[in-house]
Amino acid sequence: MRRPFKTDAPVKDGPRSNREIRIPKVQLIGADGENMGVVPTDQALRMAEEAGLDLVEISPNVEPPVCKILDLGKLKYANQKKAAEARKKQKIVEVKEIKMRPNIDTHDYEVKMKAMGRFFDEGDKVKVTLKFRGREMAHQELGMKLLQQVKADTTEFAKVEAEPKLEGRQMMMVLAPK
């Protein structure tokens, strides 16, 4: 049973620093990157305070833990910048759809292919959908032929992720950039 009004300990993110390091001895790396060997934690804290910096635990899983004398604020700032840069570089792959009919004109086909090329340049996947109307369902081979032509025209910059298949009155194929 929990005690009323007792809050859990706050969850700390980032490495332990200064007084949070409660191990008797640590492997110390100085502010300029030199290895100072195994040092008592009190002495390491004193050295960090004299330098006006913080004692930060770098590798807690080794015996003794590796600590470094550095500016904790600068370390946190650098980590935030690195995380923001990684988030910025992440590209969410979207699936763009190109709709056609089996009896598409050559110029219309070229315009659709140009749009498809633009989508691949942006790193997006393309879903090619062929819609059949009325009696066009009797000539599914024309639709398959058109999708094979799309596949052949995009081989240098795209690969087929999902082969052409018929679902109801639509034939679909998914292409992904190489």
Swiss-Prot record:
Q: What is its main location?
A: cytoplasm
Q: Which InterPro entries does this chain map to? A: T_IF-3_C_sf, T_IF-3_N_sf, Translation_initiation_fac_3, Translation_initiation_fac_3_C, Translation_initiation_fac_3_N
Record's keyword annotation contains Cytoplasm? yes
Localization, UniProt: Cytoplasm
List GO terms (cellular component aspect).
cytosol; membrane
Q: Which UniProt keywords apply?
A: Cytoplasm, Initiation factor, Protein biosynthesis
Q: Which molecular-function annotation in GO is an example for this chain?
A: translation initiation factor activity
Alphabetical list of Gene3D superfamilies matching this protein: Translation initiation factor 3 (IF-3), C-terminal domain (3.30.110.10), Translation initiation factor 3 (IF-3), N-terminal domain (3.10.20.80)
Top-level taxon of the source organism: Bacteria
* Pfam families listed in its UniProt record: IF3_C (PF00707), IF3_N (PF05198)
Asked if the keyword Cytoplasm belongs to this entry, the reply reads yes
Span list, region Disordered = 1-20
Gene Ontology BP term (one): ribosome disassembly
- What is the protein's known function? IF-3 binds to the 30S ribosomal subunit and shifts the equilibrium between 70S ribosomes and their 50S and 30S subunits in favor of the free subunits, thus enhancing the availability of 30S subunits on which protein synthesis initiation begins.
Instruction: Spell out the family assignment given in the record's similarity comment.
Output: Belongs to the IF-3 family.
Q: How does it assemble?
A: Monomer.
**Name the UniProt record assigns to this protein:** Translation initiation factor IF-3
* Gene designation: infC
